[in-house]
A protein has these predicted regions:
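Catalytic His-Asp segment of secreted/periplasmic serine-dependent ester chemistry enzymes
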Residues: 79-180
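Conserved active-site region of classical short-chain dehydrogenase/reductase
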Residues: 55, 59, 161
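Structural recognition of the beta-strand scaffold that forms the well-ordered cores
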Residues: 1-5, 9, 73-78, 123-126, ...
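Generic structural signal for well-ordered alpha-helices
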Residues: 58-62, 110
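A short helix->loop->beta-strand "cap" motif at the edges of active sites that frequently abuts
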Residues: 67-73
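The substrate-binding groove and active-site-proximal loops of carbohydrate-active enzymes
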Residues: 40-55, 97-101, 151-154
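Oxyanion-hole/transition-state-stabilizing segment in secreted/luminal serine hydrolases
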Residues: 1-52, 82
Length: 180
């Protein structure tokens, strides 16, 4: 199972949010071998499943996948780099060097996917770094993206091939599972 997330969340300015709340609870903090227990406060993490945020959406999806497919490996993939795309008068998407309408830069979504891999114990395939696609470069845009002038967001067949090669290599390198 693979989850490839982040680019549409960036474009739609979905707030990053947090993976957890951290309420403070009173707990037994000391109590050994017949001693009277002593109480104190400790922060505790509770996962957030609010799909209004990027982190909450990731938690929601991965929570369901872990429940529905407990024996299957789940791989998280970072989004590839992105650049200018114009799909019509009301659908213009800027490149990753611009913050989205919420003031958040693209690389923050990339880093959030990386963090999610650790939160959910999922192998990470960092396509943002591994596949070598960089649509802000004119030569790369011409070779590996749908249209050098209007779509530096979606890979061409050549771009998909590079992504597939990176994924195949990463699966061999990071997979701790038997593949059935």
């Amino acid at each position: 199972i693979s989850v490839f997330a982040g680019t549409n969340d960036y474009n739609k300015a979905r707030p990053i949010g947090s993976f957890y709340t951290e309420p403070v609870e009173e707990k037994v903090i000391v109590g050994y071998d017949g001693e009277e227990p002593r109480y104190g406060t400790r922060k505790h993490r509770d996962l957030i499943f609010d799909t209004a945020t990027f982190c909450g959406s990731i938690n929601f999806v991965l929570g369901h996948l872990r429940t529905l497919y407990p024996t299957k490996p789940i791989y998280l993939m970072t989004p590839i780099h992105r650049a200018y795309a114009k799909f019509g008068g009301d659908n213009i998407q800027y490149d990753e060097l611009y913050a989205n309408s919420g003031g958040v830069f693209f690389d923050e979504y990339v880093e959030t996917v990386k963090k999610a891999a650790n939160v959910w114990a999922c192998p990470l395939i960092d396509l943002n770094a591994l596949c070598g696609l960089y649509p802000r470069n004119d030569t790369h845009a011409a070779l590996f993206f749908a249209n050098e002038s209007t779509d530096r967001l979606h890979p061409s067949a050549g771009g998909h091939k590079r992504m597939a090669q990176a994924i195949a290599h990463a699966l061999r390198a990071v997979s701790p599972y038997d593949h059935e």
